């Protein structure tokens, strides 16, 4: 399924102090407020990974949020890459991989 001009999907990898600080829960709440679909999960290497799909301004707002995260987080960098369209309904926390 091709992305429309109004809808984008991005893969994020967040580095820094981002586990054990409610990052996933906070990102899930932010994504739901913005109407972004997808998921977020911890990785065993200490990063957080997410897939965000939706209207371009909403996805960009979530990416902007990812650079800050919740108050206890210390984000060092956020890698963002284009991704294939996502057919997720809603935004969920997934298990660590």
Swiss-Prot record:
Supply the alphabetized keyword list: Hydrolase
> Which reactions does this protein catalyse?
an acyl phosphate + H2O = a carboxylate + phosphate + H(+)
SUPFAM superfamilies listed in its UniProt record: Acylphosphatase/BLUF domain-like
What Pfam families does UniProt report for this protein, alphabetically? Acylphosphatase
Q: Where is the Acylphosphatase-like domain?
A: 9-95
Q: Does the keyword Hydrolase apply?
A: yes
EC code: 3.6.1.7
The record's section on InterPro entries has: Acylphosphatase, Acylphosphatase-like_dom, Acylphosphatase-like_dom_sf, Acylphosphatase_CS
Name the Gene3D superfamilies on file. 3.30.70.100
Catalytic center residues:
24, 42
Enzyme class, first EC level, given as a word: hydrolase
PROSITE patterns, per the entry: ACYLPHOSPHATASE_2 (PS00151), ACYLPHOSPHATASE_3 (PS51160)
Extract the GO molecular function terms from the UniProt entry: acylphosphatase activity
Similarity-based family: Belongs to the acylphosphatase family.
Q: Which PANTHER family does this entry report, sorted A to Z?
A: ACYLPHOSPHATASE
Name of the protein described by the UniProt record: Acylphosphatase
Q: Which organism is it from?
A: Acidovorax sp. (strain JS42)
**What gene name is given for the protein in this entry?**
acyP
């Amino acid at each position: 399924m091709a992305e429309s001009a109004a809808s984008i999907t991005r893969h994020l990898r967040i580095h820094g102090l981002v586990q054990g600080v409610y990052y996933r829960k906070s990102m899930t709440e932010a994504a739901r407020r913005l109407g972004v679909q997808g998921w977020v999960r911890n990785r065993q290497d200490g990063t957080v990974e997410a897939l965000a799909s939706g209207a371009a301004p909403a996805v960009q707002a979530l990416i902007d949020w990812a650079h800050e995260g919740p108050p206890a987080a210390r984000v060092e960098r956020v890698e963002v890459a284009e991704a294939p369209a996502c057919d997720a309904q809603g935004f969920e926390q997934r298990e660590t991989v």
